[in-house]
Regions:
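Pre-Walker A segment
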Residues: 1-78
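Helical mechanochemical/support elements of P-loop NTPase systems and associated helical scaffolds
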Residues: 28, 32, 44-47, 56-60, ...
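Short beta-strand-centered segment that lines the nucleotide-binding/catalytic pocket of NTP-utilizing
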Residues: 73-85, 104, 184
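A short beta-strand-to-loop transition that corresponds to the Sensor-1 phosphate-sensing loop
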Residues: 80-81, 130-133, 149, 184-186
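Conserved motor-coupling elements within RecA-like helicase/translocase cores
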Residues: 90-98, 102-128, 136-142
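SF2 helicase catalytic motif II
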Residues: 134-182
C-alpha cells in the first residue's frame, strides 16, 4: 500500500498571536481599569465613556484578559461588520487563536464552526467578536460582554423579525449567565 488516508480537522478561520505584542496602559487607562473592576463589585453593568481614540480598546483588552484568566468566555459586540477587521487584528495579536468572529459575511460553514466552538466552550472561542447576531450563540460560561459604541443605532434590529436592541439584549443575556457588561461609548 502506497498511500495512507488521514483525516485532519482544521478550522477555516485561524488567528495567530504575535509573541512580542504587549499593551502598556497609561496612568489614566490603568486608573480607569481599576475603577471598572471596583464598580463591577457593585454593579453588573457599567458605562465607559471616552472620546474616539482615547484608548478604550486597550482597557477592554486588559479587562478581557482578566476574565480569560478566570476561564470565562467573553462576547465583544460591535455595531457594524466593517469594524471587525481592524479589531480582529488587534485582539488576535494579543489573544491569538482564542478569538472567534461571528457575523453574516461568514458563510454558513464558518458560522457553524464558530457556533460549535462556543457550544463546546473551546479554547478557540474564548473571545467571540461579532455583531448583533452573536448574542444568540450558545454560551455556557459567559463572564463578560463588551458592547463597543453602545450608542450606535445599528444595534437596533428592525427587519427581519425578531426586533430587538442588542445592547438591551446583551444586558439580559448577562443576567442569565451572571456575567458583567461593559458598555463603551464616545
Amino acid at each position: 500500500q502506497i498511500f495512507e488516508e488521514y483525516y485532519i480537522n482544521t478550522d477555516r478561520v485561524s488567528f495567530e498571536k504575535e509573541d512580542d505584542y504587549q499593551i502598556q496602559l497609561s496612568e489614566v487607562q490603568a486608573t480607569t481599569l481599576e475603577n471598572i473592576k471596583e464598580k463591577f463589585q457593585q454593579f453588573d453593568v457599567n458605562l465607559l465613556h471616552g472620546v474616539t481614540a482615547s484608548g478604550k480598546t486597550e482597557v477592554y483588552i486588559k479587562l478581557i484578559e482578566e476574565f480569560l484568566q478566570q476561564d470565562k468566555q467573553v462576547l465583544f459586540l460591535l455595531p457594524e461588520i466593517a469594524l471587525t477587521t481592524q479589531l480582529v487584528q488587534r485582539l488576535s495579536a494579543y489573544f491569538g487563536n482564542q478569538i472567534a468572529v461571528f457575523h453574516s459575511k461568514y458563510n454558513s460553514n464558518e458560522r457553524v464552526e464558530v457556533y460549535n466552538h462556543v457550544l463546546q466552550n473551546s479554547e478557540k472561542a474564548k473571545v467571540v467578536l461579532g455583531v448583533r447576531s452573536a448574542l444568540f450563540l450558545p454560551f455556557s460560561n459567559l463572564g463578560l460582554i463588551v458592547v463597543d459604541e453602545e450608542h450606535e443605532a445599528t444595534y437596533k434590529q428592525q427587519d427581519p423579525a425578531p426586533r430587538y436592541h442588542a445592547r438591551d439584549a446583551a444586558i439580559v443575556l448577562a443576567k442569565f449567565h451572571n456575567a458583567k457588561v461593559l458598555l463603551g461609548s464616545a
